[in-house]
């Protein structure tokens, strides 16, 4: 991220290496340089041990990565790039627009995910990050306002439950990332075929069929107007019949 910049020419900086000097985020200390390698190894081991990743898992990984802050510079930018590339492997259509448009909100949300002041009854919360990533990954339209994150903000319009526009609330479902990606594609294109889902996600046909069966069993989707010429209907946010 810093290759070719003035920082990359400093003696204490090596592109791609873990930090050699302590750093902090929003006035809060992060992992010490001598702790970084072990903490990153533990974080990656914990995440990779999970066979089926969920929306909550990717959020938890991101928060813990930021708490470690393994690099001297560019941690937030690097994490954003990693996130975008990783989500694309599941078939999500994501880009850097959300990070650019809401960069200040995103940084503040990271701080609120780590900030505790127990003496004054203030606890760390990830709900603001949840809304950001829900917009990024799942296409919801939560209203992202910095003032909602102020610890003394009294009138809670931060929409921790309801988005600005009542789209299907995929962020509240018990699904893996693979299943969420397929569900989002069906939501956007109810006539999509299984072979098209294979192309979009890079998954095998058997995997797509398994996911579709799961989504139907959970009553998240159903087939209407026949098997051959019909289409899919998303039942999220609708009464099940």
Predicted feature residues:
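FIC/Doc superfamily catalytic core
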Residues: 1-241
């Amino acid at each position: 991220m810093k290759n070719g910049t003035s920082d990359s020419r400093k003696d204490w900086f090596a592109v791609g290496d873990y930090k050699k000097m302590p750093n902090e985020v929003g006035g809060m200390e992060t992992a010490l340089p001598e702790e970084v390698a072990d903490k990153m190894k533990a974080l990656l081991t914990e995440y990779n041990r999970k066979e089926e990743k969920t929306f909550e898992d990717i959020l938890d990984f991101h928060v813990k990565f930021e708490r470690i802050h393994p690099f001297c510079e560019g941690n937030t930018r690097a994490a954003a790039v990693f996130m975008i590339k990783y989500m694309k492997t599941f078939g999500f259509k994501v880009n850097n627009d959300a990070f650019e448009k809401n960069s200040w909100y995103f940084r503040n949300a990271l701080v609120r995910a780590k900030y505790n002041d127990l003496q004054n009854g203030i606890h760390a919360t990830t709900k603001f990050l949840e809304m950001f990533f829900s917009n990024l990954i799942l296409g919801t339209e939560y209203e992202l306002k910095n003032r909602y994150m102020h610890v003394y903000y009294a009138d809670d319009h931060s929409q921790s439950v309801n988005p600005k526009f009542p789209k299907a609330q995929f962020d509240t479902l018990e699904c893996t990332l693979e299943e969420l990606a397929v569900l989002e594609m069906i939501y956007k294109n109810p006539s999509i075929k299984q072979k098209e889902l294979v192309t979009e996600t890079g998954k095998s046909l058997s995997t797509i069929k398994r996911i579709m069966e799961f989504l139907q069993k959970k009553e998240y989707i159903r087939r209407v107007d026949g098997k051959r010429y019909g289409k899919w209907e998303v039942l999220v946010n609708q009464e099940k019949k």
